[in-house]
C-alpha cells in the first residue's frame, strides 16, 4: 500500500501536542464564574494561571479571546453554559494560547464558532457549535487541535475548516486510542470538513451527514486519513479530493478505528468519493456511495482503493 508520509508525521504531532496539553502544574485552581455584563470569560481568562480551570455557568454574551500568553487552562461549561458571540466580524472564541481545553459549552454567533490560530493548541471537547456566520471550527496558521465529542451543525460555512499548514485530530485523542470519541457534523452550509492549504487531518469515527456540499473536502496540497466514519446524504460527494492532495481510507485489512473503512447508509447526492487534479486515494472503499455510484476519478488521479465493499 502506498503510504502517506505526512499522516505518519502528524500522528507523532498528535502525541507530542497532547503531552503539552495534558501537562499542568501541581497547584491548579478551579475558579467559578457566573456570566453577567460585568463578570465575563474574557476578564476571567486574564487572571488564569497554568493548570487552572474556569468553571462557567449561565449565558455569556461575548466574543472571547484567549491570548498567546495563556497556557494550559480549561474552560468548562459543564454541559450547561452558553457563549453567544454578538460580534459577527470576529470568532465567538479565538485561541492563540497553547494547552487550552474548551469543553461543555453551547457556542453560537460570531463569524466562526471556535478558531485556533497563530500556533495555538487546543482540545475542543463535548460542545455544541451551531448557528455561526461562517465556520463552526477553524484551525489555521500552523495550529493544532483535537476535536472530539462535539455536535457541529447549522453553520453557514464548513462545519470544520483546517488550513494554513495546520493539523487536526478529529474524533480521537491519540493514535493509541482503541475507541473513537466521535463528532456529529451535520446540516452545515458548505462542507462538513474541509482540509486545505497544505494541512493534514486524521478523521476517525465521526458521523458526517446532510451538509450542503461534500462530507469531507481535501484540497490545495493537503492530506487526510479518513476512517471508521459514516458519511451520509451530503449534497455533493461523500469525499472530494483535488488539487494535488491525497486521502488514505484505512488499511488494506484490519478492524481497528484507524484501519476500518467508511460507510454510507443514505447515498450522497453525487458519488461516494470524487478525485480530480493530480490527487490520489488509497485504502478501502468500504460502502462509500452516492446516487451516481461509488467513485469518480479523472485521468490525472491515482486510484489505489480496494473496492470490495465492507472488507
Residue ranges of predicted features:
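All-beta strand scaffolds that present successive hydrophobic residues in beta-strands
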Residues: 74-77, 100-103, 121-125, 144-148, ...
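C-terminal segment of classical bacterial N-terminal signal peptides
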Residues: 16-25
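Extracellular beta-strand solenoids
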Residues: 33, 56, 66, 77, ...
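Structural detector of coil-to-beta-strand junctions
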Residues: 63, 90-94, 113-115, 135-136, ...
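Bacterial N-terminal signal peptides that target proteins for export
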Residues: 1-12
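Consensus "Asn ladder" position of solenoid repeat domains
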Residues: 105, 127, 132, 150, ...
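Acidic Gly/Asp/Thr-rich repetitive segments characteristic of extracellular carbohydrate-active
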Residues: 30-57, 61-65
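Extracellular beta-strand-rich solenoid/capping regions of secreted or surface-exposed proteins
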Residues: 61-74, 83-121, 135-142, 162-165
